[in-house]
């Protein structure tokens, strides 16, 4: 099953899904790190967000990257900086504008990993926020970049899971 983003939903997703921390780079992620308060899991989505999170001394329990930012290749420093010697490295295909069943399964199956997981996405990882919020333990933090605004932290609650499931239900379903 592939879940495809509809034009109406694309507009809805421009609104941050959690708490927006305005700014960019190290200063923005420093505010995020200070506010984290030891969640059960930290999941970062996006190369630049993951890079600055690791640079701030926080290795996420799971990160999803695609070697791009705003549809352009990231520089060598960011690409290298999203790697960490403790990561279990995985790979999945997920085209832009969709959430594939393979992406959902990989996130779900590895959420309980005791070692940090880095998932390289062939395609686009932006919508991985949806399965991350569905499968992360309650209290976890899902962190992603909001283009030209800052970084968003989604605290996983039962209510947030219901919102996430509702988003997934609004997406167009296509057989693979």
From Swiss-Prot:
Residues the entry annotates as binding GTP: 47-48, 66, 125
InterPro entries with a match to the protein in the record: GTP-dep_dephospho-CoA_kin (IPR007164)
Pathway linked to the protein: Cofactor biosynthesis; coenzyme A biosynthesis
EC number of this enzyme: 2.7.1.237
Reactions mediated catalytically: 3'-dephospho-CoA + GTP = GDP + CoA + H(+)
Listed GO biological process terms: coenzyme A biosynthetic process
The UniProt record lists the keyword GTP-binding: yes
Pfam families in UniProt: DUF359
Keyword annotations of the record: Coenzyme A biosynthesis, GTP-binding, Kinase, Nucleotide-binding, Transferase
An annotated Gene Ontology molecular function: kinase activity
UniProt function note: Catalyzes the GTP-dependent phosphorylation of the 3'-hydroxyl group of dephosphocoenzyme A to form coenzyme A (CoA).
HAMAP family: Dephospho_CoA_kinase_GTP_dep
Family: Belongs to the GTP-dependent DPCK family.
Name used for this protein in its record: GTP-dependent dephospho-CoA kinase
Originating organism: Methanocella arvoryzae (strain DSM 22066 / NBRC 105507 / MRE50)
């Amino acid at each position: 099953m592939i879940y495809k983003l509809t034009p109406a939903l694309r507009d809805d997703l421009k609104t941050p899904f959690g708490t927006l921390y305005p700014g960019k780079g190290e200063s923005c992620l420093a505010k995020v790190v200070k506010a984290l308060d030891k969640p059960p899991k930290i999941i970062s989505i996006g190369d630049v967000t993951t890079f600055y999170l690791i640079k701030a001394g926080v290795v996420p329990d799971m990160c999803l990257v695609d070697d791009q930012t705003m549809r352009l290749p990231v520089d060598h420093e960011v690409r290298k900086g999203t790697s960490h010697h403790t990561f279990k490295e995985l790979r999945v295909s997920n085209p832009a504008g969709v959430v594939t069943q393979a992406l959902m399964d990989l996130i779900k199956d590895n959420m309980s990993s005791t070692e940090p997981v880095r998932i390289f996405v062939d395609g686009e990882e932006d919508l991985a926020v949806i399965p991350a919020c569905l499968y992360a333990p309650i209290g976890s933090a899902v962190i992603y970049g909001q283009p030209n605004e800052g970084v968003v932290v989604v605290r996983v609650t039962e209510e947030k899971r219901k919102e996430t499931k509702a988003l997934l239900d609004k997406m167009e379903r296509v057989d693979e």
